[in-house]
Design a protein with these regions (language model features):
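Glycine-rich phosphate-binding loop
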Residues: 76-91
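Structural motif
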Residues: 25, 57-60, 82
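A glycine-rich helix N-cap at a beta->alpha junction
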Residues: 42-58
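ALDH superfamily catalytic-core signature
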Residues: 9-24, 43, 88-223
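Substrate-binding/gating loop at the entrance of the active-site cleft, primarily
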Residues: 1-20, 27-39
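A structured beta-alpha segment of the ubiquitous adenosine-cofactor-binding alpha/beta core
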Residues: 55-76
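Short acidic loop-to-helix transition motifs that present clustered carboxylates
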Residues: 60-65, 85-87, 105
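Conserved glycine-rich beta-strand-loop-beta hairpin in the small C-terminal domain of fold type I
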Residues: 224-229
Length: 229
């Protein structure tokens, strides 16, 4: 799974309601928090007289081979994969029934007649929840040119930091992987304040969200992708 807490908790509840056991495999950056959640769930099962082994997880650094071995095991009734393209392909070619969820990259259109203050508040609240790890939250904003300036102001009032053109170039050099163009792995799931500090753009504030403006011809570039932060 990619989003350890939300995905494991939701999947565990679905499995338990269906009277099925669960084995969770979290990415290495989430092994600690994933294991802690597993312990909490097992504790709840024990308190209610249920078998704690209904919820299990891979608690050491798992390789792709280990994950594949679990997914292809004949005792597995269903594979639920929320991860990158490689894991999704492995899940759907495992020979077991599989449900896969990849990048969402949800866009939002802010029209000229929108309530800009409400739109900004809802977008900032949604994208900043869980430090942007929710695939279904807003990842790209498409704003009508007629209200762009007013919407930028509304975003800032809602707690966002909207970068200037100069800051965008500097921020990209610090936040994106030079080889892949993707967000640096150590910034995934980090707060807006931590990301700005890493890029040397600490404003002395407690921002809830970093907004990186892009020209229309740049939408297929790195910042047009899903950003899990």
């Amino acid at each position: 799974v990619a989003n350890a807490l939300q995905t494991v908790l939701h999947t565990a509840l679905c499995c338990l309601k269906a009277r099925c056991a669960l084995i969770a495999s979290c990415p290495h950056v989430a092994l600690g928090v994933g294991g802690r959640l597993g312990e909490i769930l097992r504790g709840v099962l024990i308190r209610h007289g249920a078998n704690p082994d209904l919820v299990q997880w891979i608690f050491r650094r798992a390789s792709r081979a280990t994950t594949s071995a679990f997914m292809t095991h004949s005792g597995v009734a269903l594979v639920v994969a929320s991860a990158g393209a490689t894991v999704l392909r492995a899940a759907h070619s495992s020979g077991r029934p599989a449900l896969g969820m990849g990048a969402a990259n949800t866009p939002v259109w802010v029209a000229a007649d929108a309530d800009l203050a409400e739109a900004a508040q809802l977008i900032v609240a949604s994208k900043s929840f869980d430090h942007g790890l929710t695939p279904g939250c807003e990842h790209n904003l498409v704003v009508d040119r007629a209200v762009r300036a007013a919407f930028v102001e509304a975003l800032e009032q809602a707690g966002a930091v909207v970068l200037s053109d100069y800051d965008v170039e500097h921020f990209a050099r610090q936040a994106l992987d030079a080889e892949t163009g993707s967000l640096r792995a150590d910034l995934i799931g980090q707060s807006a304040a931590e990301i700005l500090a890493h890029a040397g753009l600490d404003r002395g504030l407690e921002p809830r969200l970093v907004v990186v403006p892009q020209a229309p011809d740049k939408v297929l570039g790195p910042w047009g992708r899903e950003q899990l932060a």
